[in-house]
């Protein structure tokens, strides 16, 4: 994989020169960060997150280089990646056989090929970013630097095929068949199915619904369906203000988990923005979040300040506090009901 990354980097200067006359475009993103967790984890790994995952350590949250192909009837994206969020996200990637597992999968953020079947219908296949939720893996594209709990505990990526239908410029619908809940390698003989519908009601208001259904148990365990549904509303009352609310609910084997987030972003002036988030997440039976202690029933709030220092350079700082009904957050060698994070990031896009 290292040889593959070096090969891509070697062609970047040439590719950049022809980008303006070619359907192939090269771009990239580097997100550096420093995070302070008041729990001061002894192994430096922060709990219950993949973003800014290391305490008191300068590191790379996500760095990727991408090749994008855009033609009238063919499209594709190849993105190679590294960073602590990558290490965290692929830690649970199953290893089944000799050519699977996190060490093989984690450096591919996306490797997807798309072909237009009709004027309004596309077929895409490969490793792709998830169709779930309202937040991106790439922090630059989110109103807050850190992701909400509902985004952290829903799939970041998936491997499969999808059909995307855009009957009008205001409605987009897709159906997808994937290997499972955030896994490239298979865990059983079944596939999961998902769907999403996005509808732009007006220039200021858009809504979306998404779902995923499948058996996530290994072959040697009894089959049990996981059902997941979510919805999001994005309201942009002005060029300077955006409000996004998202809610998810899932169930498996008689247990239910749910969560929600309300995010607001205000552009104070060009180059300066403020963002705030309230969130809630309840996984009483620890279906997705194993605490090793009490149930994960947590609420939280965050406040962020974003500065654009130069074209393509963004400095983001966020403070986030989480509070649980039970003591679940590591606090040195004990557990606490609260967790406080201060993180600052310097990112480059090109």
Feature roles, as predicted:
Residues 28, 56, 60-69, 110-115, ...:
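Residues on the lipid-exposed face of transmembrane beta-strands in outer-membrane beta-barrel proteins
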Residues 21, 70-74, 118-120, 130, ...:
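Outer-membrane beta-barrel channels and translocator barrels
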Residues 33-58, 86-110, 117-202, 208-215, ...:
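Surface-exposed coil loops of outer-membrane beta-barrel proteins
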Residues 25-29, 77-83, 124-126, 176, ...:
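Outer-envelope exported proteins of Gram-negative bacteria
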Residues 1-22:
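Cleavable N-terminal export/targeting peptides
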Residues 52-85:
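Glycine- and aromatic-enriched membrane insertion/assembly motifs of diderm outer-membrane
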Residues 21-36:
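Short N-terminal segments immediately surrounding and downstream of signal-peptide cleavage
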């Amino acid at each position: 994989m290292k040889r593959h990354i070096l090969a891509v980097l070697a062609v970047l200067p040439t590719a950049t020169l022809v980008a303006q006359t070619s359907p192939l475009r090269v771009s990239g993103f580097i997100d550096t960060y420093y995070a302070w967790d008041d729990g001061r984890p002894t192994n430096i790994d922060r709990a219950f997150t993949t973003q800014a995952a290391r305490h008191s350590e300068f590191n790379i949250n996500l760095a990727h280089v991408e090749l994008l192909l855009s033609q009238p009837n063919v499209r594709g994206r190849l993105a190679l990646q590294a960073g602590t969020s990558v290490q965290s996200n692929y830690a649970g990637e199953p290893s089944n056989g000799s050519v699977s597992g996190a060490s093989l999968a984690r450096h591919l953020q996306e490797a997807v090929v798309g072909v237009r079947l009709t004027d309004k219908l596309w077929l895409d296949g490969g490793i792709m970013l998830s169709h779930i939720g309202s937040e991106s893996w790439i922090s630059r594209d989110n109103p807050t630097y850190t992701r909400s709990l509902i985004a952290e505990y829903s799939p970041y990526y998936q491997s499969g095929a999808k059909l995307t239908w855009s009957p009008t410029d205001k409605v987009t619908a897709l159906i997808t068949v994937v290997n499972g809940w955030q896994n490239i390698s298979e865990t059983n003989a079944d596939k999961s199915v998902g769907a999403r519908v996005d509808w732009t009601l007006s220039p200021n208001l858009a809504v979306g619904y998404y779902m995923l259904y499948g058996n996530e148990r290994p072959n040697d365990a009894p089959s049990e369906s996981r059902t997941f549904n979510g919805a999001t509303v994005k309201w942009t009352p002005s060029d300077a203000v955006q409000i996004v609310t998202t809610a998810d609910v899932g169930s498996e084997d008689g247990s239910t988990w749910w969560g929600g987030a309300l995010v607001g972003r205000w552009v104070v002036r060009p180059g300066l923005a403020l963002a705030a988030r309230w969130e809630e997440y309840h996984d009483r039976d620890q279906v997705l979040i194993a605490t090793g202690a009490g149930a994960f029933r947590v609420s939280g709030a965050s406040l962020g300040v974003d500065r654009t220092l130069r074209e393509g350079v963004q400095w983001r700082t966020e403070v986030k506090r989480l509070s649980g009904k039970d003591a679940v957050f590591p606090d040195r060698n004990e557990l606490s009901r609260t967790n406080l994070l201060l993180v600052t990031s310097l990112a480059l896009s090109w």
